[in-house]
Amino acid sequence: MRRTVRKTEIWGFYYMRRRIQVEAEKPQFCVTTGITFAQADAWFGNTVQDLKLDLIYPRDNTRKYPCVVWICGGAWIQMDRSAHLAYLSVLAQQGFVVASVEYRTSNEAKFPAPLQDVKAGIRYLRAHADRFNIDPDRIGVMGESAGGYLTCMAALATDPVYDVGENLEYSSAVQAACPWYPPTDFRGFPYSDPEQCAASPESLLLGKNVMRHPEEALACCPVSFVTKAAPPFLIIHGEDDHTVPFGQ
């Protein structure tokens, strides 16, 4: 049985036999997790724990990049520094180094411990700026909710009492802050009575009932630290927020 083979079929066989070279696209950013930046007392001074950060950075290491320090939320009761790496990678694609830092929660240590941890992370990044291709003069801080509070405090609180631990020869100052729905005045939460407030995240952070100790609570709030010397702020907050009131 004879069959006529058309020219188009011959060319089809020819192209099917050709080897097509496809180069894999190089990633635009890299991720390194679990970098220990400090050690701190935990469980009220009875143990020691490593504080770690995750780093997302552009693949091109031929120049220095501005750095965004990310602080996750969790009502100071829990936190997961790696929870948001997927969308934080967008910043690395735009030319930022992103460092997501760990801090002690309120069941491990009370204020100012979490702020001291964040500032220790900032100092560590400055101390290792060359290693991580960071421009030490362009470090900003960003965080959500409880992390937004720590973002405000990291940008505003300059008293040396908040800088403890290693790398003290480096500054923990930041050049910009972007808090997302941050608690800024603990007295402004709508608790009906002191007994209800005793178990609030703010009271657990301070180790004191913020309704019974309003002056001490205010002394730990970002509104008490605002000055003309503060770096630029971009505050992001939804008007219908029922967890952190918009008035904060």
Regions found by a protein language model. Give the residues of each.
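Alpha/beta-hydrolase superfamily serine-hydrolase fold, recognizing
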Residues: 1-248
